[in-house]
């Protein structure tokens, strides 16, 4: 039973997707933070979802060149629903800009680096390690009781 629990917890920790939530607004003029700062502090994997929340705005996925130029004329993806969910389906950089005139130039743009699910890094270890620790603790309680 212990081994089965370890396997189930490890598998569930490694294959589940995550939903990242973001308030998609024009950054304040005096802000030193950017959406790229936010994105670089997150770990995005294939299958993860990003939820953009905004009012009277839009979000576009664009090419690298369109991102650099804040060009919204040919988006790969466009939404203006106020609550947009976007799923990452490839391990590539994704480029997002606001489709509202002038917003991208004011910093409402972001690059998201997405890695594959089988990509291993040191930050992937804690969920599995936590599952093993939890199972060990549970097993210890079983033998003590």
Swiss-Prot record:
It is a lipid-anchor; GPI-anchor. It comes from the Eukaryota. Its main location: membrane. Glycans are attached at residues 30, 71. One of its GO terms (molecular function) is electron transfer activity. Disulfide bonds join 70-104. SUPFAM superfamilies: Cupredoxins (SSF49503). May act as a carbohydrate transporter. Belongs to the early nodulin-like (ENODL) family. This is Early nodulin-like protein 21. The gene is ENODL21.
């Amino acid at each position: 039973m212990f081994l089965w629990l370890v396997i189930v917890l490890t598998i569930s920790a490694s294959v589940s997707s995550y939903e990242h939530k973001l308030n998609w607004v024009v950054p304040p003029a005096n802000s030193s933070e950017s959406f790229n700062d936010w994105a670089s502090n997150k770990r995005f994997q294939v299958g993860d979802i990003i939820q953009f929340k905004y009012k009277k705005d839009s979000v576009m996925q664009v090419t690298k060149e369109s991102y650099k130029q804040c060009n919204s004329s040919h988006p790969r993806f466009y939404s203006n629903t106020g609550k947009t969910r976007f799923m990452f389906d490839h391990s590539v950089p994704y480029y997002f800009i606001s489709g509202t005139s002038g917003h991208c130039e004011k910093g409402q743009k972001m690059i998201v680096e997405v890695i594959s699910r089988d990509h291993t890094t040191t930050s992937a270890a804690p969920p599995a390690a936590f599952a093993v620790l939890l199972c060990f603790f549970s097993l210890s309680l079983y033998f003590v009781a």
